A protein has these predicted regions:
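A ligand-binding cleft/hinge motif common to bilobed small-molecule-binding domains
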Residues: 108-114, 231-254
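Short, polar/charged alpha-helical segment
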Residues: 40, 45-78
Length: 346
């Protein structure tokens, strides 16, 4: 996830309104490097070509492209990338009539659509995931939350490093922290899930609201914003994606990461096949299988969260307290948490 901006919008019965505002769309065609006229007529090839709609970052698209090109699908697919809300909106508006054969999207979106409209087919030859997952999606990448500090600014500010996310609500951290806004970033939802799991929804919402108040001008719409503020020396403490802070520390920056006592919560993005009945692309299932089987090693380099049995990551990329929210993650639950936090801050 290059952290795409999120906006809280109402989710109607048709789910036409979605909430994560992302970047604009572009097209990345997997068939541009291959021979367009190899063995089939263009019309026949087009009929079998797999259209993939994705909200993934450039690194993830590149990894999936490498996997497909190296395993017999060069020239047999087209990627089209969208912001999360844009892709969610297309799925809501078009349903099974959408052009895409395969979608990759945040799992809470996929689950919400499946619950409402049964948009996705059960996957064949699905690899075994570490955490239980439904039959209609398979994860492609995961992101885990953590606290991080600029060690130099922390010392200059004469602050103790926090042990918990809740510590950031203390008066001494006011003006010294940067966190993502629950209304603007899915990364903030990781922070909110952690605090609500530890304190309950009502008390947790008050804590998150107090943290946002302490952040002041450093309350960021982008999930990557807090770490950027720490790199620039504009804040001492922040919350964001753990692997990004690990990478900064490895590069020699004065950044360190802290696994909060509330836990390291996780969000996943996954691939699913659009169920179009008899019109379902016969190659779609194989494309998803190849992305997972051959794309995961490269994806792990950019998103070092083990998702499948047998996968391993380096010691520094293993969170001390891996955690998952007690309820299934859905768009509706995110909206509920957004409202609860903002109401608590009034």
């Amino acid at each position: 996830m290059n952290l795409k901006k999120l906006l809280a919008l109402g989710l109607s019965l048709t789910m036409a309104a979605t909430l994560v505002a992302g970047c604009g769309s572009n097209t990345n065609a997997g068939d541009t490097s291959g021979d367009q006229t190899a063995d089939k007529t263009s019309s026949d090839k087009s009929a079998q070509q797999v259209i993939i709609y994705s909200n993934a970052d450039d690194e993830a698209i590149t990894a999936m492209t490498h996997a497909l090109d190296s395993n017999g699908y060069q020239g047999q697919y087209v990627f089209q990338t969208f912001g999360t809300s844009e892709l969610g909106g297309k799925l809501a508006a078009e349903g099974k009539n959408i052009e895409a054969d395969v979608v990759t999207l945040s799992t809470y979106y996929l689950d919400s659509f499946q619950k409402k409209e049964k948009l996705f087919a059960d996957l064949q030859n699905k690899a075994k995931t570490i955490q239980p997952s439904p039959s209609y999606w398979t994860p492609i990448l995961g992101n885990t939350g953590a606290l991080f500090v600029n060690t130099e600014v922390l010392k200059q500010s004469k602050l103790e490093a926090p042990k918990s996310i809740a510590d950031l609500a203390k008066p001494e951290y006011a003006g010294h922290i940067s966190v993502p806004d629950i209304m603007g970033s899915s990364t903030s939802w990781l922070m909110t899930q952690a605090v609500m799991s530890a304190q309950g929804e009502e008390a947790g919402a008050k804590t998150v609201a107090a943290i946002e108040k302490n952040a002041g001008a450093h309350l960021e719409k982008s999930g990557s914003g807090p770490l950027k503020k720490l790199r620039a020396g504009e804040a001492a403490v922040g919350f964001g994606l753990r692997h990004q802070a690990v990478a900064d520390k490895a590069r020699g920056l004065p950044i360190d990461y802290i696994d909060p006592t509330e836990g390291n919560f996780q969000l996943q993005e996954a691939a699913a096949v659009v169920d179009k009945g008899a019109k379902t692309n016969p190659n779609a299932q194989k494309v998803v299988e190849i992305i997972v089987k051959y794309g995961r090693p490269e994806l792990l380099k950019f998103y070092p969260v083990a998702l499948y049995e047998g996968e391993t990551v380096s010691a520094e990329n293993k969170p001390a307290r891996p955690s998952f929210y007690k309820e299934p993650l859905t768009v509706e639950l995110l909206q509920k948490h957004q409202k609860t936090v903002k109401d608590a801050g009034k």
